[in-house]
């Protein structure tokens, strides 16, 4: 029995990046032997064990053979005769097929992963890559993480990904797996690379058709020098990642904010009247299909509906600002306003030539919200108030608090 450190921990160490969880592969052992050493079996589809002291995952070396449709149609063989090289060969990319023997501090790299790391290439290991459609999404997600380091996908791997997209295999992916790869990409510094990669291999139209529909839809060049709405969406996604690193909630809301532009009549292009309202349905549809968590869905719908109101905040009446806060449920969920402000700033700055622009609307929205939030029912003289009068009085008090942050003169809010 011998164990090797494998996968992401080895790859990240060689890249000089912070390593995540340590995964180990065990050669020459069976489940009974692992359990006799105190390891706890946790694998459902293949033998995986938790170390009795560290809790790290140790998987028995295995091979996989395709015997059905989709990413679950595999026969797994995990017995003591499976070699390390055979186990590494079943993996997706060469950079993930490097093992570290810690007993003598050597690397086992049968498929050229170290060289591909040095050349900044994401390359599949073997034709078996095409047997698992999930790997198309994994490649896109890896690009969201690795593109900032200068990585690109090998031409032969792109070709195989296109063939996989054309085969219909991607239709077998369950919504939860698509969401998992999408949401993880939103935690990286360049989530637009996820979208760009999928679109390059014609997979975006299959797994995320609502987002794919934005490409080729023109916007007015005076406001959007990048013109293409799909490109704007990529810029906004990357800007959101810059403004709120690792925040997948904000990232998803930023991703959905302009979905309505794909539904505006062609006759109105490059203008998109009512795209905020039009975007609610595809945002809901996307969220429900992928089984997106409820808090993600709610913030995405808020951003879709309200982003133009935040952009023109200086033109809004005090009572209109209060109504905006109410629609966001901002008095019960105060965190939403700061989140919305970041999404709107990402939208504003996610345009060619506006990357470093100031966006005072975000800070001002937070100030208006803070002023209104500071007022509560306990502050009211409630002796002569009954029933709905209390709520009405509280609303008026909060509107006065909003007004106190600046003077609205019918055209522009001061102190902005």
Curated annotation (Swiss-Prot):
Its EC number is 2.7.7.72, 3.1.3.-, 3.1.4.-. CTP binds at residues 8, 11, 91, 138, 141. One of its GO terms (biological process) is tRNA 3'-terminal CCA addition. It comes from the Bacteria. It holds the Pfam family PolyA_pol_RNAbd. Keywords: ATP-binding, Hydrolase, Magnesium, Metal-binding, Multifunctional enzyme, Nickel, Nucleotide-binding, Nucleotidyltransferase, RNA repair, RNA-binding, Transferase, tRNA processing. Mg(2+) binds at residues 21, 23. The keyword ATP-binding applies. GO terms for molecular function: ATP binding; CCA tRNA nucleotidyltransferase activity; cyclic-nucleotide phosphodiesterase activity; magnesium ion binding; phosphatase activity; tRNA binding. InterPro entries: CCA_bact, HD_domain, NT_sf, PolA_pol_head_dom, PolyA_RNA-bd, tRNA_CCA-adding_enzyme. Comprises two domains: an N-terminal domain containing the nucleotidyltransferase activity and a C-terminal HD domain associated with both phosphodiesterase and phosphatase activities. Catalyzes the addition and repair of the essential 3'-terminal CCA sequence in tRNAs without using a nucleic acid template. Adds these three nucleotides in the order of C, C, and A to the tRNA nucleotide-73, using CTP and ATP as substrates and producing inorganic pyrophosphate. tRNA 3'-terminal CCA addition is required both for tRNA processing and repair. Also involved in tRNA surveillance by mediating tandem CCA addition to generate a CCACCA at the 3' terminus of unstable tRNAs. While stable tRNAs receive only 3'-terminal CCA, unstable tRNAs are marked with CCACCA and rapidly degraded. Belongs to the tRNA nucleotidyltransferase/poly(A) polymerase family. Bacterial CCA-adding enzyme type 1 subfamily. This is Multifunctional CCA protein.
